């Protein structure tokens, strides 16, 4: 017996706020728009094959992968070289200051960053984080612990 899925719009409505908060925490407000759209486009394509046991963890896993894609793409961007480089003022930071917490989270090693974001910004259990990252539950727990420990050290230094 197969369990029928609710309509995709209902799925989107149920999870949009969680995905949005997770992506803003992961990639920042500006990039979150694009990642959000890509997340739900991918989710819509894969929706008929989704296992209904934990749809929230499933869509946050997709969001996590889109955030990783965003960071990979930023690393590949061409850098202009030459004497004719334009002088551009840094845009104002539209997000409120947070004492550098999110900058420090973004500076964590990728496995720790993913575990911390999924666990705390995504509010997933360690088991769900493990599934999202494709690691054991113990590895997910360890990565979150090590990431938090590193953040505490940096915040108190």
Place the predicted regions along the sequence by residue:
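Short, small-hydrophobic-rich alpha-helical interface motif
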Residues: 19, 23, 32-43, 62, ...
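C-terminal flanking helix
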Residues: 20, 40, 109, 113, ...
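Sigma70-family region 2
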Residues: 2, 29, 38-55, 73-75, ...
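A short pre-motif secondary-structure segment
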Residues: 115-119
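Acidic, proline/glycine-rich intrinsically disordered inter-domain spacer in sigma factors
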Residues: 2, 6, 74, 83-106
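A short, charge-rich alpha-helical start-of-domain segment used by transcription regulators
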Residues: 1-21, 113
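Arg/Lys-rich amphipathic alpha helix in sigma70-family domain 2
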Residues: 61-82, 94
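DNA-recognition helix of helix-turn-helix
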Residues: 64, 68, 133-157
């Amino acid at each position: 017996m197969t369990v029928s899925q609710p309509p995709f719009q209902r799925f989107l409505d149920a999870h949009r706020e969680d995905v949005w908060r997770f992506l803003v925490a992961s990639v920042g407000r500006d990039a979150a728009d694009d990642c959000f759209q890509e997340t739900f486009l991918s989710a819509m394509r894969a929706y008929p094959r989704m296992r209904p046991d934990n749809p929230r963890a499933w869509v946050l896993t997709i969001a996590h992968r889109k955030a990783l894609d965003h960071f990979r793409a930023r690393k590949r961007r061409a850098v202009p070289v030459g004497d004719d480089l334009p002088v551009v003022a840094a845009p104002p930071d539209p997000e409120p200051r947070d004492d550098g917490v999110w900058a420090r989270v973004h500076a964590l090693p990728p496995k720790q960053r993913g575990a911390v974001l999924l666990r705390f910004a995504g509010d997933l259990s360690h088991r769900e984080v493990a599934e999202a990252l494709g690691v054991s539950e113990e590895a997910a727990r360890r990565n979150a612990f090590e990431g938090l420990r590193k953040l505490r050290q940096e915040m108190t230094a």
